[in-house]
C-alpha cells in the first residue's frame, strides 16, 4: 500500500522557458508583425509569457505566490522588448 506524498508526485505543469531564440521578446518575426499591424491593433510580443502566467493562476486557484517565476518571466520579456525598441530609436507608433 503506497500513499502519495507531495515529493512522490510529479509536477507536469510547464515552467517558464529560458532564453530560447524562438521566445525572444523582440525577434525579427515579432518586429515584422509589430511594424505591419494597423495603428488600432494591439500586439504584445510577450503574449506567450502572459498566457503562461494566467494558466498558472488558474491551475493554482489564484494563488500568486505559486506563480512568481511566470510573473518574472513576463516582466523580463517586457523589459527586454522595451529596451530593444528604445535602442533602435523608433517610436511606439
From Swiss-Prot:
Residues 1-40 are annotated as: Disordered. It is found in: Mitochondrion intermembrane space. A motif (Cx9C motif 1) lies at residues 46-56. Its main location: mitochondrion. Keywords: Disulfide bond, Mitochondrion, Transit peptide. Gene3D superfamilies: CytochromE C oxidase copper chaperone (1.10.287.1130). Disulfide bonds join 46-77, 56-67. Residues 43-85 form the CHCH domain. Required for the assembly of cytochrome c oxidase. InterPro entries: COX23, Cys_alpha_HP_mot_SF. One of its GO terms (cellular component) is mitochondrial intermembrane space. A motif (Cx9C motif 2) lies at residues 67-77. Residues 8-40 have a biased composition (Basic and acidic residues). This is Cytochrome c oxidase-assembly factor COX23, mitochondrial. One of its GO terms (biological process) is mitochondrial respiratory chain complex assembly. Belongs to the COX23 family.
